[in-house]
Amino acid sequence: VSLDASTVTLVRYALLDPRVLILRAEEEVDAFAVLTERFVLLLDTMSTPALAEAALDCLRPHLRQRPLLVLNTHADYDHAYGNRVFSAGGRHPTAIIGHRTAAARLTSQGERERLERRQRENARYADVRLVAPTVLVDDALTLDGGDLTLEVRRAPGHTDDHLAVWIPQLRMLLAGDAAEYPFPQAGGTAGLRGLESTLTMLAALDPDVVLACHGGTTSASLLTSNLAYFAQVRAKARAAFTAGGLPNSEVETVFAFEDALRLVGTDSKRVAAFYRSFHEGNVRAALRDLAAG
């Protein structure tokens, strides 16, 4: 994604509770802020320190002397590469909440190598430094904001370190990348199983509003739409496997990309091109799962 280094817009929807703010980095990612009586929670720090600083500038008028907390939904670059702004020596040092596995990812040699590769390929990542969460979550964490309760829940599948936030007073789910329009990316075969379980768990909360980091939707129907998509991925993979298909089968012959988009009410002219690779990965994960027995 190519975007200005500090382009973050505060997005408002008329029916969205004013205590929840959407911070949009053009078409790359949405972060969110929850304004409680006791603190403000920033959900994700985007893909660069410059974007995190721009998000902080959007938030500053809303802090009103309340402490700021930060939460990483997971350690992917577009959700955690701005953490430096909130670390010791950064512009606004504060606690960063994340899953224990996210901390391990952000301190790993593999993640350092991925960042170095990004920095060689794109100057926008030059100022990124890997900063791990400082408050670690294993399964769940409750943040009591006074007027709002923020229930941090483990939500694996897209990645193993993924967290989502449920706000019961608003019947609102901050889904991160666990739900996505048109559909999320499962992290391999184990991730596919995990994501199906996570979506089922999140749908059982019966939210009125679902905010995801990609797709720009607020509709609670996103969860059932994602579940219907994965059910069809499973059905198509099963039919192909029964007919002799192998994990390396041509995905278009198993479940065509346009057919998948039509199922969720869109087409390739209205979604980013990378969703094709998401879909191919999801179908291959289902085929591998069947091959493994």
Which residues does each PLM region occupy?
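Conserved beta-strand hairpin/beta-sheet module of binuclear metal-dependent hydrolase folds
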Residues: T9-P61, A164-D177
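Short, conserved active-site entrance elements at the starts or edges of catalytic domains
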Residues: A5-R12, V131-R153
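A post-motif C-terminal structural segment
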Residues: G215, N226-F257
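Metallo-beta-lactamase
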Residues: F39-V40, S47-P49, T142, T149-E151, ...
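C-terminal regulatory/interaction regions
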Residues: A243-G293
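Active-site HxH/HxHxD metal-binding segment of metal-dependent hydrolases
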Residues: D57-L136, T142
